[in-house]
């Protein structure tokens, strides 16, 4: 009797497409993390640093605050009272330990009152007039948000693509559905980064499957610089997102990928395993296994 092989379509998250863009091997190691001890290494690594707040952890806390700023823009835009803005900043900083509890615990951090105060002080001292002025001035995105509101971290799933993801903000402006992403890194001189275009294209395809409408544009908020950029969702971005989706599926099914061209190996928790696995793969190839 002939055996019928049922092809199981591997589920993929948009965040895994972004890991692939940084380095394809991150997808490989993160997928295998639970079963093979990689995760316990990463955990021990953060536990060992738990007693002090390192510069890297401080910058992560700052990223959480910036992200919350982006979610609270409607309170800041148009506000001219500096005392009110200081109070809003206080509220945002104080909400961070509750909203990002899982992430902070992952870092081995508990944001005690003293630390929150210190973070708040540093943050307020680090703000500059130009940045605040840009946040307080209405732009195309904040106008859309004022008129239509937005849904925070909307989770979407496409059965056709077997792809899921949650976009930071989803604006439904009458017939148009617009994805919006918050980024805490630097902005490019013009437009949006290639990886951000690919991520927006992936969200666009999820939205199209869920809402049945074509997504033509998306926004990226580079909140650290108060830069709000709109970008068209191009055919080439969609094609690249689909191509990466295919590669991520292969990796999740066991393929060991090459390193990314600009892989950030010096800060990677998997560097120890990465070389071991490379050797093992080469050896396996030589032995024909
Ligand atoms: S060590 Fe380098 S190549 Fe290996 S997973 Fe990390 S970033 Fe990628």
Briefly describe each language-model feature range:
Residues 71-75, 209-211, 219-225, 257-265, ...:
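Noncatalytic linker/hinge segments flanking ATPase motor cores
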Residues 1-172, 286-289:
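Metal-dependent nuclease catalytic cores that hydrolyze phosphodiester bonds in DNA/RNA
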Residues 30-39, 208-214, 276-280:
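Short helix-capping/linker segments at secondary-structure and domain boundaries
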Residues 211-213, 241-254, 284-289:
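Short, surface-exposed, charge-dense and proline/glycine-enriched linear segments
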Residues 1, 8-11, 247-262:
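Short, intrinsically disordered, charge-biased short linear motifs at domain edges
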Residues 15-29, 253-289:
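Cysteine-cluster motifs in flexible loop/terminal segments that predominantly coordinate metals
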Residues 141-246:
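Mg2+/Mn2+-dependent nuclease catalytic core
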């Amino acid at each position: 009797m002939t055996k019928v092989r049922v092809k199981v379509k591997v589920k993929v998250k948009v965040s895994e497409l972004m890991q692939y863009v940084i380095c394809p091997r991150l997808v490989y190691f993160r997928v295998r993390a639970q079963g093979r001890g990689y995760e316990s290494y990463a955990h021990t690594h953060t536990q060992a640093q738990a007693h002090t707040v390192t510069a890297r952890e401080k910058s992560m806390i700052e990223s959480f605050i910036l992200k919350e700023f982006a979610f609270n823009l409607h309170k800041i835009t148009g506000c001219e009272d500096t005392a009110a803005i200081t109070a809003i900043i206080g509220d945002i900083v104080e909400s961070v330990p509750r909203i990002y509890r899982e992430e902070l615990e992952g870092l081995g951090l508990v944001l005690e009152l003293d630390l929150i105060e210190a973070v708040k002080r540093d943050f307020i001292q680090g703000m500059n007039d130009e940045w605040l002025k840009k946040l307080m001035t209405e732009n195309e995105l904040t106008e859309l948000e004022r008129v239509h509101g937005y849904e925070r971290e909307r989770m979407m799933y496409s059965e056709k693509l077997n792809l899921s993801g949650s976009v930071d903000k989803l604006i439904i402006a009458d017939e148009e559905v617009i994805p919006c992403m918050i980024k805490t890194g630097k902005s490019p001189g013009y437009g949006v980064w290639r990886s951000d275009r690919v991520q927006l294209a992936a969200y666009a395809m999820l939205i199209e499957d869920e809402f049945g409408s074509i997504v033509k544009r998306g926004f990226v908020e580079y909140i650290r610089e108060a830069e709000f950029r709109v970008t068209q969702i191009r055919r080439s971005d969609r094609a690249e997102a689909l191509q990466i989706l295919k590669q991520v599926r292969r990796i999740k099914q066991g393929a060991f990928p090459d390193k990314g061209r600009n892989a950030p190996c010096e800060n990677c928790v998997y560097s120890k395993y990465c070389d071991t696995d490379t050797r093992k793969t080469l050896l396996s190839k030589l032995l024909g296994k």
